[in-house]
């Protein structure tokens, strides 16, 4: 069930961002409505990530990603860090961090409205591209075609406390999209 919730929330977030990207050329939104859509899209993306994390924590082996990268006897810290300890989960983490920065940037009050809108539209384009990449090539919400009672376990190389602190590195790279956009 968490796989379905995660997948659908990711697809809806991509759809909202596609709508926002088109709004630059077709629709003329008010700032409040535009920012509301950005925030809703960000929350849907976070719901998608936390759905995957929930599947890891409860050892939902009906999710193929969880089956491939987790085991019911793993400590909780490795179940949580197993969420981003693989390609699919890491891409979803990156997209979630990008969404968090878009969410907070949409609350910014002391900048030019057209600059803020253009920055968020480019962030929406990044969200669309990464979201489509995740959905079509790196889907972490694939359903396991066979019933299994146990997962294969996390790669032994990744069973390190350093994996648990990996997200700050992703945050440091991802937040650089906001100051880079005005330079483009």
Per-region residue spans from a language model:
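Short aromatic-rich membrane-water interface segments that cap or initiate transmembrane helices
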Residues: 1-7, 71-90, 152-171
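Structured, charged N-terminal subsegments at the starts of enzyme catalytic cores
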Residues: 75-77, 96, 101, 120-147, ...
């Amino acid at each position: 069930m968490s796989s379905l919730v995660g997948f659908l929330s990711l697809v809806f977030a991509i759809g909202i961002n596609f709508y926002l990207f088109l709004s630059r050329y077709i629709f003329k939104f008010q700032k409040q409505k535009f920012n509301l859509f950005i925030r809703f899209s960000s929350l849907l993306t976070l719901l998608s990530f936390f759905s995957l994390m929930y599947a890891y924590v409860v050892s939902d082996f009906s999710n193929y990603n969880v089956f491939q990268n987790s085991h019911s006897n793993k400590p909780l810290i490795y179940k949580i860090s197993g969420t981003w300890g693989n390609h699919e989960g890491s891409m979803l983490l990156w997209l979630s961090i990008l969404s968090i920065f878009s969410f907070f940037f949409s609350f910014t009050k002391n900048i030019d409205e057209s600059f803020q809108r253009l920055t968020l539209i480019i962030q929406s384009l990044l969200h669309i591209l990464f979201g489509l990449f995740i959905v079509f090539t790196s889907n972490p919400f694939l359903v396991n075609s066979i019933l299994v009672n146990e997962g294969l376990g996390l790669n032994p190389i990744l069973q390190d406390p350093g994996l648990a602190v990996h997200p700050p590195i992703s945050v440091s790279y991802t937040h650089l999209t906001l100051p880079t956009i005005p330079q483009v």
